[in-house]
């Protein structure tokens, strides 16, 4: 699951995952409120599975990434999903907050395409090497 409001970054996420051989069907949410509603819906339903990984932007409309992360971590069904917080922010406070909310990894979005592709390696590591 990708929670990202920038279509260019969503494209780069797909490229990074594909470059590392990860075959995933990405669900994309463009704002935090929609992502929170989805997690709450998953908690209410017995049959739907949680995503295996969440790639979460911090600066989102309607509800920021940290609100989404709080919701995920308090979820009875999806609370243990690996979450990679990805942001263009270099603020130490953002990294500290992500760590305090139990994000599994923090990825600062680079301006270089080649460096952005390293997100795929991080996702692969979070998924335990599955393809």
Regions found by a protein language model. Name each.
Residues 31-34, 64-70:
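Acidic catalytic/metal-coordinating carboxylates
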Residues 109:
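A Lys-centered signature of the CheY-like receiver
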Residues 104:
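Short, glycine/charged-rich "phosphate-handling" switch motifs in NTP-dependent
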Residues 28-53, 116-117:
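Acidic, metal-coordinating helix/loop segments flanking the phosphotransfer/catalytic sites
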Residues 1-18:
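Conserved acidic segment of CheY-like receiver
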Residues 61, 91:
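The feature encodes the CheY-like receiver
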Residues 56-57, 87:
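Active-site residues of response regulator receiver
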Residues 44, 66-79:
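Short amphipathic alpha-helix used as the core "switch/output" element in two-component signaling
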């Amino acid at each position: 699951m990708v929670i990202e409001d920038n279509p260019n970054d969503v494209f780069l996420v797909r490229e990074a995952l594909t470059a590392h051989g990860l075959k995933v069907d990405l669900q994309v949410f463009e704002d935090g409120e929609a992502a929170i509603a989805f997690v709450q819906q998953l908690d209410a339903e017995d049959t739907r599975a949680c995503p295996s990984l969440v790639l979460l932007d911090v600066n989102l409309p309607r509800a920021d990434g940290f609100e989404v992360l709080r919701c995920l971590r308090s979820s009875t069904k999806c609370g243990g999903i690996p979450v990679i917080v990805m942001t263009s922010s270099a603020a130490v406070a953002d990294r500290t907050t992500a760590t305090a909310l139990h994000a599994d990894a923090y990825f600062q979005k680079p301006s270089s395409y080649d460096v952005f592709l390293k997100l795929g390696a991080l996702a692969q590591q979070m998924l335990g090497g599955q393809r």
